[in-house]
């Protein structure tokens, strides 16, 4: 019974394959939706791709060209002869890649909706905040002994990325067109940027490439996760059977036979229900409370799994295993990037079961997180809000917008950062970042009106600064208008929000 259940778990649910993705490539609303989604994704992004030139007329010309013979086969000679295409060469490919990114995500969205319907789970309850990892670490830090991390192979050949989609998309026309587009785009840019075509492609098509890349990594991670769970259920496992698992993806139909082989001398190879795995910033990381020997076994199994079945070159010498104590006092995660930014302290919480009963002191682990000023200033400098040392400067590219639009853009950035770092224990660095954004906003407005900062502030008064208050500050000052000490104490408190599902653009500075 247990074996049959395991066999069912191995079968990937691909019943929701979509046969009608190809016609969507020629629909105008797909590219309009892709453009609007990219524009609204982050106010920080400069629209260097096609925002200023985007129009439905260009979309119609693009679709007309795609309807022509040979579809997307565009040679260098063709681009030189066609004046319109030569001028908008990168524009065409950028728009097509954004359209593909929308289309290939449709089957995955359908699977998510169907899974929610089958489980009858309210969608709001299914949200998972990336900040939930910090409360998780508070309970797990004292019990983890070793950490293994290694770089995931990158880049991967484009053909492998296309092959991954064959499991999810049962539409040969879409796959052929996708393969043709990738190779033509790659070859065309190889003429312009030799030896850097893959990096150029990734930079210009981040969402599309990351979707394909994550789909590829998910394939062998799903196998790895399954075996991690089974190592706990099948505690006494044959070493011969363990080797068979390396190729079990191609032997799903013989899964029962593999597990019903002769049970000879048992070897407890893997027995660790306390292993935790995470993929972060291109690294494969897993931690455990057991011995280094067990970690080495997991390491070489992951290498064999990737190399033998998925043809991914995982180099064992680049996967390092270190005592977890080295990371307990210096940890970088999700934008909290400074050294010693995470410290594990003991917090005493007093509780009383009944009135007039004795008090109980409960010792809890507290994970103190601080905002690192250097990476954030580097991100602000990259976005032209300040110079390299943190002095605010005006934003010339925004000077053509209206006053309300300029203020709204700065306020949104400021509030998003406050929201993202709301769980920080020490927010002095965050106050400096907010000061830089406020002064950069004032300098941008003064530049627009050809005035000085001092004169502009006198004319505008304190109304501008009030715009930068977050919702939390406004509520606190509304409840405690006179008790400034109480309001400051509450505002300095840590609040982890459960609706943060991606890393803030400024926090993800490289």
Curated annotation (Swiss-Prot):
Signal peptide: none annotated. Keywords: Chloroplast, mRNA processing, Plastid, RNA-binding, tRNA processing. One of its GO terms (molecular function) is RNA binding. One of its GO terms (biological process) is RNA splicing. One of its GO terms (cellular component) is chloroplast. It comes from the Eukaryota. It is found in: Plastid, Chloroplast. Usually encoded in the trnK tRNA gene intron. Probably assists in splicing its own and other chloroplast group II introns. HAMAP family: MatK (MF_01390). PANTHER family: MATURASE K. Belongs to the intron maturase 2 family. MatK subfamily. This is Maturase K.
């Amino acid at each position: 019974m247990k074996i049959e259940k395991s066999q069912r778990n191995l079968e990937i649910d691909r019943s929701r394959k979509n046969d009608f993705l190809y016609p969507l490539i020629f629909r105008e609303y797909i590219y309009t939706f892709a453009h609007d989604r990219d524009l609204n994704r982050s106010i920080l992004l400069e629209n260097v791709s096609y925002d200023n030139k985007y129009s439905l007329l260009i979309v119609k010309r693009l679709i007309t060209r795609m309807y022509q013979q040979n579809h997307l086969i565009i040679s260098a000679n063709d681009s030189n002869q066609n004046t319109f295409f030569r001028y908008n060469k990168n524009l065409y490919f950028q728009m097509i890649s954004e359209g593909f990114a929308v289309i290939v995500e449709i089957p995955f969205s359908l699977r998510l909706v169907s899974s929610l319907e089958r489980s009858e789970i309210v969608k709001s309850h299914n949200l998972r905040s990336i900040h939930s990892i910090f409360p998780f670490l508070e309970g797990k830090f004292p019990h983890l002994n070793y950490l293994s991390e290694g770089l995931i192979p990158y880049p991967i050949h484009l053909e492998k990325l296309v092959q991954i989609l064959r499991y999810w998309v049962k539409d040969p026309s879409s796959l052929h067109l996708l393969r043709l587009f990738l190779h033509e785009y790659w070859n065309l840019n190889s003429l312009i940027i030799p030896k850097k075509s893959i990096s150029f492609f990734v930079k210009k098509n981040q969402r599309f490439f990351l979707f394909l890349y994550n789909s590829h990594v998910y394939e062998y991670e799903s196998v790895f996760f399954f075996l991690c769970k089974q190592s706990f259920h099948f505690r006494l496992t044959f070493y011969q059977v363990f080797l068979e698992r390396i190729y079990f993806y191609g032997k799903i139909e013989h899964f029962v036979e593999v597990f019903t082989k002769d049970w000879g001398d048992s070897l407890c190879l893997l027995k660790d229900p306390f292993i935790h795995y995470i993929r972060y910033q291109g690294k494969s990381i897993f931690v455990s409370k057991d011995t280094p020997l067990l970690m080495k076994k997991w390491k070489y199994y992951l290498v064999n799994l990737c190399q033998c079945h998925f043809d991914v070159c995982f180099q064992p010498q680049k996967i390092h295993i270190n005592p977890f104590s080295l990371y307990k006092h210096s940890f970088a995660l999700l934008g909290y990037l400074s050294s010693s930014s995470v410290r594990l302290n003991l917090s005493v919480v007093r509780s009383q079961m009944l009135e007039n009963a004795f008090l109980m002191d409960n010792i809890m682990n507290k994970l103190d997180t601080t905002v690192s000023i250097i990476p954030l200033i580097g991100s602000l400098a990259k976005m032209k809000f300040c110079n390299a040392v943190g002095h605010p400067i005006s934003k010339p590219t925004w000077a053509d917008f209206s006053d309300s639009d300029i203020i709204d853009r700065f306020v949104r950035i400021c509030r998003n950062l406050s929201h993202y770092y709301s769980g920080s224990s020490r927010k002095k660095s965050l106050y400096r970042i907010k000061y830089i954004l406020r002064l950069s906003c004032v300098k941008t407005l003064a530049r627009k009106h050809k005035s000085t900062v001092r004169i502009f502030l006198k004319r505008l008064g304190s109304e501008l600064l009030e715009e930068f208050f977050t919702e939390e500050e406004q509520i606190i000052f509304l409840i405690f208008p006179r008790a400034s000490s109480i309001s400051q104490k509450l505002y300095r408190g840590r609040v982890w929000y459960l609706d943060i599902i991606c890393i803030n653009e400024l926090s993800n500075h490289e």
